[in-house]
């Protein structure tokens, strides 16, 4: 977390460090209880080593607190399974994202993101705003000094499908996409409507290339999601990425189409 600590991860690290100090545990004693070396604990606490879900679970074991820190991650807007992906996203040198049904979270406007999150009508207003704030914080990934090269493939239908009362939100969202698409580190490609059959129909996925050149992936479903690091599975998703990317429009044609589509919402 040396270059730009993720707000959520940095907060959790601070709370773990504070709890350790309040309990009187040394880093060595805490590490024995958590299953990590004292040097590992020191590196996480000084934010020179990434916070992981395993470390959070280890902290809960060391403090015997019934899973407090893992629950805290969820309460602050990110499910615990998502934390490894947040770290991958933050440290990645390259990001790839395919979305057949929504604008990717890293590209969403606040209004669009709020509307999407509100589709889950079981969430309270406070929970909606917590999740939205977390999503907006993540977008710093694409604008920081060491921003990764980000390539998104979005189905054209995503930009054309909305309720009548969604017009202003959608217009604002597409305008933001056209602005972001002008950034040198961001490529946005539209998968045109006429490509009706493709390998991406089975669902969205993302890929991240880490500083050690290893690729990891993330997939979501109705019950949550999973971060994938098994080489064979990542290779399969990389192959599918290449297939959907090859079906999408080139960068400039995609930008021109976005500018055309936005006029239908204004």
Regions found by a protein language model. Name each.
Residues 1, 60, 69, 85-88, ...:
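Bulky hydrophobic/aromatic packing residues
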Residues 94, 100-266:
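Hydrophobic protein-protein interaction segments
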Residues 2, 70-102:
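Short, charged recognition helix plus adjacent turn
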Residues 45, 89, 220:
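Acidic-residue sensor for enzyme active/binding pockets
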Residues 41, 80-82, 201-202:
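Short secondary-structure transition/capping segments
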Residues 19, 72, 76-79, 244, ...:
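Short, leucine/isoleucine-rich alpha-helical interaction segments at C-terminal helix-coil junctions
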Residues 1-76:
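Basic, Lys/Arg-rich alpha-helical nucleic-acid-recognition elements, primarily the DNA-binding modules
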């Amino acid at each position: 977390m040396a270059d730009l600590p993720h707000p959520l991860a940095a907060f959790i690290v601070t709370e773990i460090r504070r709890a350790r100090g309040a309990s009187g545990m040394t880093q060595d004693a805490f590490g024995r209880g958590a299953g990590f070396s004292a040097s590992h604990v020191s590196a996480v606490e000084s934010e020179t080593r990434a916070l992981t879900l395993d470390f959070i679970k280890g902290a809960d074991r060391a403090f015997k607190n019934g899973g407090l820190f893992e629950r805290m991650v969820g309460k602050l807007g990110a499910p615990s399974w998502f934390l490894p992906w947040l770290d991958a996203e933050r440290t990645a040198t390259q990001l790839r994202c395919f979305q057949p049904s929504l604008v990717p979270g890293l590209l969403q406007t606040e209004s669009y993101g709020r509307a999407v999150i509100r589709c889950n009508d079981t969430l309270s207003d406070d929970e909606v705003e917590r999740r939205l704030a977390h999503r907006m914080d993540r977008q710093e990934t694409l604008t920081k000094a060491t921003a990764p090269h980000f390539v998104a493939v979005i189905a054209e239908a995503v930009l054309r499908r909305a309720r009548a009362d969604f017009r202003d939100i959608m217009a604002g969202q597409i305008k933001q996409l056209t602005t972001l698409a002008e950034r040198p580190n961001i490529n946005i490609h539209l998968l045109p409507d006429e490509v009706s059959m493709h390998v991406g129909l089975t669902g969205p996925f993302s890929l991240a290339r880490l500083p050690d050149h290893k690729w990891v992936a993330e997939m979501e479903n109705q019950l949550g999601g999973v971060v994938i690091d098994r080489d064979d599975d990542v290779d399969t998703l990389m192959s599918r990425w290449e297939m959907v990317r090859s079906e999408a429009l080139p960068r400039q044609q995609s930008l021109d189409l976005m500018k055309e589509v936005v006029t239908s919402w204004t």
